[in-house]
Amino acid sequence: MSKVIETKQQVVTEIADKLRA
């Protein structure tokens, strides 16, 4: 479960970074 949350957080961070750029 912890890994799933970590992966989701990573994806969210990636999307946020793309939106900023």
From Swiss-Prot:
Record's keyword terms, sorted: Ribonucleoprotein, Ribosomal protein, RNA-binding, rRNA-binding
Any one GO molecular function term: rRNA binding
Ranges in coiled-coil conformation: none
GO cellular component: ribonucleoprotein complex; ribosome
UniProt similarity note: Belongs to the universal ribosomal protein uL10 family.
The protein's role, per its UniProt record: Forms part of the ribosomal stalk, playing a central role in the interaction of the ribosome with GTP-bound translation factors.
Subunit description: Part of the ribosomal stalk of the 50S ribosomal subunit. The N-terminus interacts with L11 and the large rRNA to form the base of the stalk. The C-terminus forms an elongated spine to which L12 dimers bind in a sequential fashion forming a multimeric L10(L12)X complex.
Miscellaneous comment as given in the Swiss-Prot or TrEMBL entry: Under acid-stress, this protein is expressed at a higher level in wild-type B.cereus than in the acid-sensitive mutant strain NB1.
Official protein name in the record: Large ribosomal subunit protein uL10
Organism name: Bacillus cereus
Lineage: Bacteria, Bacillati, Bacillota, Bacilli, Bacillales
Originating gene: rplJ
